[in-house]
């Protein structure tokens, strides 16, 4: 079974409805925002409640544990997201309103995200760049990218990011 979050899949609908409901569920949002690692997210009651809802919507019980860890990372990050931006995540990182030609996320910081040695480092790095993007990302895109994190997603991000031109001397 391929894990896919979109508006047509059960798990995509549950995730999007949950995220939209976070505005009114300030306690759950605060608990998730305080989590400093993927493990800390996975141990929170709000994550566990959502995980049970996702299982009911089609998230397989036998899903590999690394998928569950990646889901926890996505949920922790989504608690920081305030706006659903339909653009691809890397595109959002490279296009910043009011910054002229400068990207929201610098080239160096973007490369560091791509080179994250493990999921916790990626989680921390993404949590730090969310304010640079005004807390607006593609909700379902972020979940998909994290659950499927690997070379294919990294390459897609590299192709989507609008690398700034170097000034000519």
Where are these regions (language model features)?
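Basic, alpha-helical nucleic-acid-binding regions used in initiation and control of genome expression
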Residues: 2, 7-169
